[in-house]
Regions:
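S-adenosylmethionine/decaboxylated-SAM
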Residues: 30-249
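Mobile, glycine- and charge-enriched loop segments
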Residues: 1-45, 141
């Protein structure tokens, strides 16, 4: 049995156990419900299947939370490396905000065995991503689910486009939020990104993805196209979502 298969079994078992319980624990025994903070099983499986589909072998994630999306990505990496082994930094996840859950997300990585192939960067993404770029890091795929403020998401996507290989997939969560949609509006009009939208009633409904269009900068120095969420393709986008409304499952 290869290292990848052994880890796949361990991660899958941990995911199944966690979602059966419906919560994770911190080291002090305090419980943190999976919903609404983390991905449900079907959402996480949809993310896993996207990573498998892309054949990604090195991935980047912004936002650890309770680690359910991380474990789904790592399960996919194990599948894509099934004949061999994963490097100690096969998956990089950036999250400075584990204090709210007393590092329960990190604990999930440890208990599943996924920490052995995960580089956890406990810094804000606007500090960590430029460092990765300066180190000439390269990833096959990125999953963006960190701060959901427009300026933070814009920076995350900007750097991911320079860190992910050309045509590699960049996935964003929570596309129903106005800040995410506005970033997508810019991506469509100014970067010529082609959005991949999923069945709004299916398990991937929270996500939107696009193949990284970035190569060497070829736009005129003063290029700019007007943008807004209204420039997005037809889709049941959840515009005008009131504050405090429940997050789609």
């Amino acid at each position: 049995m290869t290292q990848a298969i052994h880890l796949l079994q361990s991660v899958r078992a941990r995911r199944e156990q966690t979602h059966t319980l419906g919560h994770v624990l911190d080291d002090a025994g305090k419980t943190y419900p999976i919903w609404p903070v983390a991905y449900s099983t079907e959402n996480a499986d949809a993310l896993r299947d996207l990573v498998i589909r892309e054949g990604a072998r090195r991935t980047l994630e912004i936002g650890l939370g309770l680690a359910q999306s991380s474990l789904a990505i790592i399960e996919a990496l194990c599948k894509n490396h099934a004949a061999g082994s994963l490097a100690a930094d096969a998956h990089t996840v950036i999250d400075p905000g584990q204090a709210w859950c007393n590092r329960a997300g990190v604990r999930e990585l440890d208990l599943s065995g996924a920490r052995t192939v995960t580089r956890f960067i406990e810094q804000p993404s606007h500090l960590a991503l430029p460092q990765l770029l300066a180190s000439n890091e390269r990833f096959d795929l990125a999953f963006v689910d960190g701060m959901h403020l427009f300026d933070y998401v814009m920076l995350d996507v900007f750097y991911c486009m320079r860190l992910v290989k050309p045509a590699g997939l960049i996935i964003l969560d929570d596309h129903w939020m106005p800040a995410i949609q506005t970033v997508l509006g810019f991506a469509v009009t100014n970067w010529d990104a082609k959005l991949e939208l999923f069945d709004p009633k299916g398990p991937a409904r929270r996500m939107v993805a696009f193949a990284n269009p970035f190569q060497d900068e070829q736009r005129p120095w003063d290029h700019f196209a007007e943008f807004s969420a209204q420039t997005l393709p037809e889709y049941p986008w959840k515009r005008n979502q009131p504050r405090g409304a429940p997050i789609p499952a």
